[in-house]
Amino acid sequence: MKRILILCFFINFSFGQKYNADVIIYGATSSGVAAAIQSSRLGNEVILIEPTYRIGGLTTGGLGQTDIGNKQVIGGIALEFYQNIKKYYENPNNWIRQEKNEYKDGGQTRSSVTENAMWTFEPSVALAVLNQMIDDEKIKVYYNERLERKEGVKKIENKIKHIVMESGIIFSGDVFIDATYEGDLLASSGISYTVGRESKSKYGESLNGNQPNTLGKTLKNKISKNGAHHNFIFGVDPYIISGNPDSGLLPYISKGGPGIEGEGDKGIQAYCFRMTLTDHPENRIPFKKPDNYNELNYELLFRNYEAANGNLEDMYSYGDPLVPWINSLMPNRKTDTNNQKGFSTDFIGQNWDYPEASYEERERIVDHHRQYQQGLMWTLAYHPRIPKKVRDKVSVWGTCKDEYEREDGWQNQLYIREARRMVSDYVMNQKNCESIEVVNDPIGMAAYGMDSHNVRRYVNDLGFVENEGNVEAYVEKPFPISYRSIIPKKSECENLVVPVCLSASHIAFGSIRMEPVFMVLGQSSAIIANLAIEKEIAVQDLNYDKLKTVLIDKGQILE
């Protein structure tokens, strides 16, 4: 009995504790961290709440190859972060696994000699840099505190009064910022939102909704590489017994086809882990076959290679045709490894329930993704049905001993590319991305292409397997993001700002949803919060000219 009482004492120790600050930020993603830093520098008392044990989100969770579009639109605290990354790597003592001059970055993230910032990094370095920036501001961070989603938001007169965690801790403040990838605070606050893809007719777009096509067209009649990329080569059979529909579909193929082109649905673009791999023998953990490994889950991978009839180098015209990944090099002989081609790290169609799922169900979905990806990597590295050329190339890699807390070298942060999206008085859409419509109240800029990963896998009219949902459309120039898109409708809440799950259509979100842009929007959210507190007004009622002046003063790029 004494043992039970002691246990109960520790379990309930924090229940009912109350904390107050000017600004309460839920979600210590890179956006939430930027918001906290800016709030502190403006003189606001700020509390940063992180549902897990690690800050930084994807920036510290594997995404070291910064998706950016145009570096010139990144200013303020976001740029400061990348400048701090460069300072870290200027120290020769921080090059442990290779010499500095041996490292070659590439693509859009290549840093020129004259740049004062660096855009590629190890996740552990990003974590150290963000922690130092937080420590410098003496920001209070509460780890492992999850919002009680059913009744954890207390509103009075259309304002959030306080929020309650599952632990029972209560946080009250003047303005709240939801900086999570999932949008749990906005949803629990009764804010309008959507999940999935709108129909292309809803906002007058061309690339939204179902995309069962090889090529799409932008509103300006430019080509979008849709099904032409990240798909199977021709002739891959979808059935358990090839050629026999009665044997049933192979795992993770949707029944019923792709849907009608341009129609909306509840489909979510695929998630994956942005793996941090290494080929350094002393730091490498070889890929392990999962305990629950099921070879049938990878039958489509085998058949995709077999359909090449030995012509492996001709399978794909982009990337490395032998391997289904993008292996971007990070410092110290590490990588940021991402999805590419038809059967890769994206677990297509297996995340649709994630945005609205309970915490427990989300954990199961994350575990399922990890098991799938662990099995994929073991298969590519060691399975005899994989061509030897491929096995030889993959098996030299493995997860890192020195990056994440898990002993197997895998991270816990799943790449939540998209979940809930707020629906506010202004919805960013494809016309904004193509500069057909330009907002007059910018709080930051986006510049990446309109990008969506695949949403479903299905059987096409020819009886072969195909992926649907990929969109790759070029954005001609950076475009401004509206102040109205990160604040809810005033009738729904007057003291909440939402920099991550902002008000945007699926295809516009595909351009905006990059980590440096989320940092920019997080910083702008803090400035909005500060002005609303100073003036004692709703976040919707700011004088934009005043807001613009402060944004520019704090380093934000608005045009």
Q: Whereabouts are the PLM-identified features?
A:
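Sec-dependent N-terminal signal peptides
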Residues: 3-13
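Aromatic pocket-lining residues of Rossmann-like dinucleotide-binding sites
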Residues: 39
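Flavin (FAD/FMN)-binding glycine-rich loop and adjacent Rossmann-like elements that form
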Residues: 127, 169-175, 179-558
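Positively charged n-region of N-terminal signal peptides that target proteins for export
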Residues: 1-4, 100
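Conserved beta-strand-loop-beta-strand element in the redox core of flavoprotein oxidoreductases
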Residues: 151-170
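N-terminal Rossmann-fold NAD(P) dinucleotide-binding loop
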Residues: 32
